[in-house]
Amino acid sequence: DLVTGFLIVDSVKRNNQLLTFTHIDSALNINFSPSLTVGTLDSVSVYYQGSPSSTGFGSFIDDTHAGTPVIWTLSEPYGSADWWPCKSQLGDKADSIDIYIIHPSAYKAASNGILQSEIVNGSQTTTHWKHRYPIASYLVAFAVTNYVVFNNSVMLGSVNLPMQTYCY
């Protein structure tokens, strides 16, 4: 079930090809042609827009801290579908996610996974985060504000892992 009362699905793509779909109430039904075999792993991109609502512990917050804008999510336990089209069931996990956040260039965007890119386009920046482990929809999160980013590393056995800390 997709609880997207405040979100409008613009289009759905698979392998960069548009797919037909219906979006009625909280259900997004995608037509695959040819049909997928049960158990097949595949990927689709859902493009959407809107003004998210906020439920639970504050699933989508647009606020300020010390006079500076901040947007953040806290989706536990069922608030994820307030701000992104997902199957909001605690036991269901996506095998991976890519998050693209378009935000004012004066700010930084943090999310799950590893930062892939920050592409500045005038007054806006597109930040791409990639997470490649199974994840429940309520654990997907992002935040945007005037972060200061500290880049460090941590030794895990013989592997030197990068570690980024976002502070404000």
Describe every region a protein language model picked out.
Residues 2-4, 31-32, 48, 103, ...:
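Hydrophobic residues in beta-strands and at strand termini
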Residues 75-76, 87-168:
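Hydrophobic helix-coil surface modules that form long, contiguous segments used
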Residues 38, 47-98, 145-153:
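Glycine/proline-rich low-complexity spacer/linker segments in large multi-domain proteins
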Residues 28, 66-69, 125-127:
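Hydrophobic residues embedded in beta-strands of well-ordered beta-sheets
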Residues 1-2, 56, 109-112:
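Short, hydrophobic/aromatic beta-strand segments
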Residues 1-3, 61-62, 114-119:
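Short Gly/aromatic-enriched secondary-structure transition segments
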Residues 4-65:
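A surface-exposed beta-strand-loop module
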Residues 27-32, 80-85, 111-114:
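Short structured motifs
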